């Protein structure tokens, strides 16, 4: 019996551990700044006024377009969702079976325990009702800015960017991460682009410390609101 209780306790601990949200770790290599590759110096052409690799177009702007360049993304995300669902199932059934004769004779027989005659009539009835209601409402707002680096320039000119920002506060750390694809035409003259213009965006806002822990339910609350709760 003790071994069985130990197995149940261990299984419950494992299930509760699976309900805990993973804590983001700093210095993720995926979000590390991508540095530009250093090209080999072009061979100097003695006697030439114009040297290869030192040219600059008169119409070139200062917007990021190479690997390792920096872009500032302004965060302006607002999402809201609401869902209501209701269901009701009801079933009633009833049946009566009556025999007027059995092999040509009346089915009533004398009751040996007294009272009226015994009858071969039978019947049943049943009712079943199932009802459920659910409602979910969620809203999120994220504003601010984060400066990221160009990780890759695709053949069609689309720029892949990613980066993160960690802020150490008195009670913990705050994390903002973003990765996605940006069109060069969407980059403003001040080298900024709104987050609503980032395609395939992966935005993470999380943190560690006492404030982050206070917003998480306890281990017993997570058990009661988990799908494992039978009621």
UniProtKB/Swiss-Prot annotation:
Protein name: Flagellar L-ring protein
InterPro entries tied to this protein: Flag_Lring
Primary location class: membrane
Keyword Membrane appears in the UniProt entry: yes
NCBIfam families: PRK00249.1-4 (NF001304)
Lipidation residue positions, type N-palmitoyl cysteine: 19
PANTHER family membership: FLAGELLAR L-RING PROTEIN
Location(s), subcellular: Cell outer membrane; Bacterial flagellum basal body
Molecular function GO labels: cytoskeletal motor activity
Gene Ontology annotations of biological process type: bacterial-type flagellum-dependent cell motility
Role this protein plays: Assembles around the rod to form the L-ring and probably protects the motor/basal body from shearing forces during rotation.
Assembly description: The basal body constitutes a major portion of the flagellar organelle and consists of four rings (L,P,S, and M) mounted on a central rod.
PROSITE patterns attached to this UniProt entry: PROKAR_LIPOPROTEIN (PS51257)
Protein family membership: Belongs to the FlgH family.
One Pfam family per UniProt: FlgH
Gene Ontology CC, one term: bacterial-type flagellum basal body, distal rod, L ring
Membrane topology: Lipid-anchor
KW Lipoprotein (keyword) present: yes
Lipid-binding residues (covalent, S-diacylglycerol cysteine): 19
UniProt entry keywords in alphabetical sequence: Bacterial flagellum, Cell outer membrane, Lipoprotein, Membrane, Palmitate, Signal
Signal sequence extent: 1-18
HAMAP family membership: FlgH (MF_00415)
């Amino acid at each position: 019996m003790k071994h069985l209780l130990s197995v149940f306790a261990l299984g419950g601990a494992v299930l509760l551990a699976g309900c805990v949200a993973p804590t983001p770790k700093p210095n993720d290599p995926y979000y590390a700044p991508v540095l530009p590759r250093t090209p080999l110096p072009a061979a100097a052409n003695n006697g030439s006024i114009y040297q290869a690799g030192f040219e600059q177009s008169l119409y070139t702007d200062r917007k990021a377009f190479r690997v390792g360049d920096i872009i500032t993304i302004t965060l302006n995300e607002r999402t809201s969702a609401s869902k209501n669902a209701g269901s009701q199932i009801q079933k009633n059934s009833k049946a009566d079976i009556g025999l007027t004769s059995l092999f040509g004779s009346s089915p009533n027989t004398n009751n040996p325990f007294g009272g009226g005659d015994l009858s071969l009539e039978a019947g049943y009835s049943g009712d079943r009702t199932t009802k459920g209601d659910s409602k979910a409402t969620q809203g999120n707002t994220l504003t601010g800015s984060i400066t990221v680096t160009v990780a890759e320039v695709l053949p069609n000119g689309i720029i892949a960017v990613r980066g993160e920002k960690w802020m150490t506060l008195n009670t913990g750390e705050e994390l903002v991460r973003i990765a996605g694809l940006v069109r060069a035409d969407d980059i403003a003259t001040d080298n900024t682009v709104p987050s609503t213009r980032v395609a395939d965006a992966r935005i993470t806002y999380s943190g560690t410390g006492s404030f982050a822990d206070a917003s998480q339910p306890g281990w017993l609350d997570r058990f009661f609101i988990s799908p494992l709760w039978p009621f």
